[in-house]
């Protein structure tokens, strides 16, 4: 949905009727007039300050700049409700839920001249998805992509040392709807994945030997390796083969592999340690709650597929 510049003073509700081309916006003001003026002045100054270092960057770099700002500075928090759903939550308080984060992304990208709208999907209680979810669709180089800074933020925040994840940076429709529900209102078709982050950074592998080579480098240099697998479906059998190569690379450097997997997006994180610990695989699931769900299993105990993983989460 294109919401325009959603300011801190207004909450936009929408009503959409099946078989109707129209979407009805219903504004609800959260503060009195004086408070609204104060927030508008503060947010205008805040946005101007934040975008200043990024004004001469390319479209893709501007998008990454905004994404990284969210992941480095915003904590998911639904308790401050009047703030968390609006841009004053993320930009003024450093907190927000998916709605506030998506609005903040749009406001910042609008100010940087990058086309951006807000996308909303429905909930699905049968799958354990309690709430609607909000993210962004951006246009980079004339092509539309999905950008979900909230999901990347939840994946990166759980570790002792926060890291920025890019699992949901410029996805096409086929990728995003692996773990997002259908949209509740029309949005541009996203049919390209050329600007997907891991592909741009040459971390999207189609060959198993590339996984082994990069894992060996990570074990040798003590660096974290995060990569995307696009050499076919990430089935249990394929994942087992990749894990064996990751283990082999660690054995050659006397290191133990600690692996985490965002299964629906086929993104694998590998970190090697000198400690004598049992090899394990953490199955991650990004979501719009305060923390993402995860299940820790041994290398030999992989579930059959991602649906099996989701069943374990629901239990």
Where are these regions (language model features)?
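Single conserved hydrophobic/aromatic residue that forms the stacking wall/gate
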Residues: 1-7, 11-12
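Short glycine/threonine-rich beta-strand-turn micro-motifs
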Residues: 13-40
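Secondary-structure boundary elements
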Residues: 31-90
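Conserved hydrophobic/aromatic pocket- or pore-lining residues that grip, position, or stack substrates
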Residues: 66, 70, 98, 109
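Catalytic cysteine-centered active-site loop
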Residues: 77-84, 95, 116-127
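Conserved active-site-adjacent core of cysteine acyl-enzyme catalytic domains
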Residues: 82-92, 96, 100-107
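Hydrophobic/aromatic-rich core segments of domains that either
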Residues: 100-175
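Low-complexity, Gly/Ser/Thr/Pro-rich intrinsically disordered linker/tail segments
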Residues: 162-312
């Amino acid at each position: 949905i294109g919401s325009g510049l959603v300011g801190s003073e207004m909450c936009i509700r929408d009503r959409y009727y099946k078989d109707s081309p129209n979407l009805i916006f219903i504004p609800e003001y959260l503060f009195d007039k004086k408070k609204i003026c104060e927030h508008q002045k503060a947010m205008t100054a805040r946005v101007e300050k934040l975008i200043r270092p990024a004004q001469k960057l390319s479209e893709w770099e501007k998008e990454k700049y905004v994404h990284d700002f969210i992941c480095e500075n915003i904590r998911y928090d639904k308790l401050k409700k009047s703030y968390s759903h609006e841009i004053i939550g993320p930009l003024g308080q450093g907190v927000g839920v998916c709605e506030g984060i998506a609005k903040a992304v749009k406001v910042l990208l609008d100010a940087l001249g990058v086309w951006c709208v807000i996308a909303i999907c429905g909930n699905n209680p049968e799958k354990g998805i309690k709430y609607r979810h909000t993210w962004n669709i951006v246009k980079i180089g004339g092509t539309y992509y999905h950008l979900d800074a909230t999901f990347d933020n939840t994946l990166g925040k759980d570790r002792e040392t926060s890291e920025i994840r890019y699992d949901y940076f410029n996805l096409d429709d086929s990728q995003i709807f692996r773990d997002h529900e259908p949209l509740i209102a029309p949005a541009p078709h996203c049919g390209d994945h050329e600007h997907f982050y891991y592909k741009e950074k040459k971390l999207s592998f189609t060959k198993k030997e590339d996984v082994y080579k990069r894992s060996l480098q990570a074990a040798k240099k003590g660096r974290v390796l995060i990569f995307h697998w696009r050499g076919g479906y990430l089935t249990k059998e394929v994942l087992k083969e990749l894990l064996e190569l990751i283990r082999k690379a660690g054995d050659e450097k006397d290191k133990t592999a600690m692996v985490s997997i965002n299964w629906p997006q086929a993104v694998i994180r590998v970190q090697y340690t000198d400690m004598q610990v049992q090899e394990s695989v953490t199955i991650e699931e990004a979501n719009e709650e305060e923390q993402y769900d995860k299940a820790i299993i041994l290398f030999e105990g992989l579930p059959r597929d991602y649906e099996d993983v989701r069943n374990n989460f629901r239990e």
